[in-house]
From Swiss-Prot:
InterPro entries: Lysidine-tRNA-synth_C (IPR012796), Rossmann-like_a/b/a_fold (IPR014729), TilS/TtcA_N (IPR011063), tRNA_Ile_lys_synt (IPR012094), tRNA_Ile_lys_synt_N (IPR012795), tRNA_Ile_lys_synt_subst-bd (IPR015262)
EC class (word): ligase
Superkingdom to which the source organism belongs: Bacteria
Disulfide bonds: none
Reactions performed catalytically: cytidine(34) in tRNA(Ile2) + L-lysine + ATP = lysidine(34) in tRNA(Ile2) + AMP + diphosphate + H(+)
Protein name (Swiss-Prot/TrEMBL): tRNA(Ile)-lysidine synthase
Domain remarks: The N-terminal region contains the highly conserved SGGXDS motif, predicted to be a P-loop motif involved in ATP binding.
Recorded GO MF terms: ATP binding; tRNA(Ile)-lysidine synthase activity
Gene Ontology terms: biological process: tRNA modification
CDD domains: TilS_N (cd01992)
Keyword Nucleotide-binding carried by entry: yes
Entry similarity comment: Belongs to the tRNA(Ile)-lysidine synthase family.
TM spans (from-to): none
């Protein structure tokens, strides 16, 4: 197979795709059956065939693996036909194909901006479909970039918003980062159209693309053609402007990153006191840079001002909460600002989880992770000397780490503690929230209220009702990772735990396991309360 003949008239398109995918070996194409994604599918399959052929020869070019997926919204009565069309096109090219069905009833309830919501549902489905090591490809092109920039201009965006889309970007989805590639972003719609006709490709037409009630369609159908008629190079110029804005933003971050990083700790909390002396412009840059670490892009002036005035400058005891983006909230604790998942604003007081089989794993609510329990017999000498073996302290057998919430091997041990085992007549449960009366901690003479204990251990108010409280019957044994009560202490209750041989002691080991995302939130406030 001669490479010159292979690329022939379409060198630019192939070159753009190769440059974008060359570092990746596992590709998932978002395939709608439209012209743009059909062109990309055709180019990818030809490149795959070419690379596979080269490997059989003397070339060191590595092949790649390709899958395609169609997202079935169910909003259009032609959706089944489109899905079947995509299936046939992929069969013809020997490309593995999968259909993802979205519950369209969720979309039909939306009263406004269904265009944006449908796009969000689609991306969520696509990211969920990714296998480990796979990257997602979409067929966005230069015309799509122009629409994106004009929409950002309509919203009053700054350079970050006007930078539009990028060819290669990391997206945050749930707790994970996924790679998104747009190989055709520097190619015009005309170039793709000419390729499609020249290769005699077949595709489907979505009639909703001409519905000018949607902003993007309005720009595509009525506005941009006028600009192009007046200024034929309009699309290229806008694309260049987006590139310049992106370079300006990258340069700004590069110049300021060292000083900004000194304000942000390893858990991405922002030490905001120095910002009091900053100008409004510099302060907004810092806040925007900080939010970008959570993939909260293009925050408005209003949002940045609200973070500063309503959260950072709020009274110490106000416990202000501000929604940031779609999935996060902003909160303050002492001299730092924190970005937290939205579900951490809800109270867990009503939760009571019976732990019927104490040697089994128990799953905590609100994605807080899981708790494991294990009965151990430890040499009494080692226990006295506080020399509990490392294997007992920070390691778990695989049987205690079932995958939960679709995590992919990123669980981390947040805390390990050793308590007395329950007696036969004691039922074990996990609860959350506030406890009345005085609590007597191990190795403490006087009792204290729970609120005072939280303050002593520097546990933020928004974290307190997310700490699992371990009970035997109605008796608090431990706030996992924070403290152990007298009733749960191995030392206080030692005489009841020593084995008959007088050389060993029976302990109950409790381990709190979390995903990496929540581990980073909790780890500064939770400890190994050993015994």
């Amino acid at each position: 197979m001669n490479s010159t003949n292979f690329f022939s008239h379409d060198l630019y398109l192939y070159h753009q795709v190769i440059r974008c995918i060359v570092k990746y070996r596992n590709l998932l194409l978002a395939y709608s059956g439209g012209m743009d994604s059909t062109v990309l599918l055709d180019i990818l399959t030809k490149l795959k065939k070419y690379f596979d052929f080269q490997v059989k020869g003397t070339s060191k070019i590595l092949p790649f693996f390709l899958r395609a997926v169609y997202v079935h919204h169910g909003l259009n009565n032609k959706a089944d036909y489109w899905a079947d069309h995509c299936l046939q096109q992929c069969k013809m090219r020997n490309v593995p194909f999968h259909i993802i069905y979205i519950n369209h009833s969720d979309l039909s309830k939306i009263k406004c901006n269904i265009e944006a919501m449908a796009r969000d549902f689609r991306y969520k489905a696509l990211f969920n479909a990714l296998k480990p090591e796979e990257v997602l490809l979409t067929a966005h092109h230069m015309n799509d970039q122009v629409e994106t920039v004009l929409l950002a201009l309509k919203r009053g965006s700054g350079p970050a918003g006007l930078s539009g889309m990028t060819q290669d970007i990391l997206y945050q989805h749930n707790e994970y980062q996924h790679r998104l590639l747009r190989p055709l972003l520097k190619c015009s719609h005309i170039q793709l159209q000419e390729y499609a006709y020249r290769k005699k490709l077949t595709w489907v037409e979505d009639d909703t693309n001409t519905d000018v009630r949607f902003d993007r369609n309005f720009l595509r159908v009525q506005v941009i053609p006028l600009f192009q008629k007046r200024w034929p190079a309009f699309n290229k110029v806008v694309s260049r402007t987006a590139q310049l804005c992106r370079e300006q933003e990258n340069l700004l971050h590069e110049l300021l990153s060292e000083s900004l990083d000194q304000l942000i700790d390893i858990d991405n909390a922002l030490f905001f006191y120095p910002l009091i002396k900053y100008s409004d412009v510099r302060r907004r840059v810092v806040l925007r840079y900080w939010l970008s670490r959570f993939f909260i892009n293009m925050p408005s002036y209003k949002l940045l001002d609200c973070i500063w005035k309503e959260v950072a400058l709020s009274k110490v005891d106000s416990q202000s909460i501000l929604h940031v983006g779609k999935k996060y909230i902003c909160r303050r604790f002492r001299k730092k600002l924190y970005i937290l998942p939205d579900n951490m604003k809800s109270s867990l007081d009503i939760f009571l989880l019976p732990w019927k089989n104490f040697n089994n794993t128990i799953l905590l609510p609100n994605e807080l992770g899981l708790l494991t329990s294990q009965s151990l017999t430890v040499n009494l000498f080692l226990f006295y000397k506080n020399l509990i073996p490392y294997t007992h302290l920070n390691m778990l057998s695989d049987i205690f780490l079932p995958r939960y919430h679709n995590n992919v091997g990123d669980e981390k041990i947040l805390s390990v503690c050793f308590i007395r085992p329950p007696m036969n007549n004691e039922k074990v449960s996990i609860q959350f929230g506030y406890i009345q009366g005085l609590l007597h901690l191990a190795n403490r003479d006087r009792g204290r209220k729970l609120k005072k204990i939280w303050q002593e251990y520097n546990v933020p108010p928004w974290l307190r009702n997310h700490i699992p409280l371990l009970f035997y019957n109605d008796t608090l044994i431990s706030a996992i990772g924070i403290f152990i009560t007298r009733n749960g202490s191995c030392i206080v209750n030692m005489n009841n735990l020593i084995c008959n041989n007088k050389k060993s002691i029976i302990l109950q080991k409790i381990t709190w396991v979390q995903s990496d995302f929540y581990y980073r939130i909790f780890k500064n406030f939770v400890y190994n309360t050993l015994r």
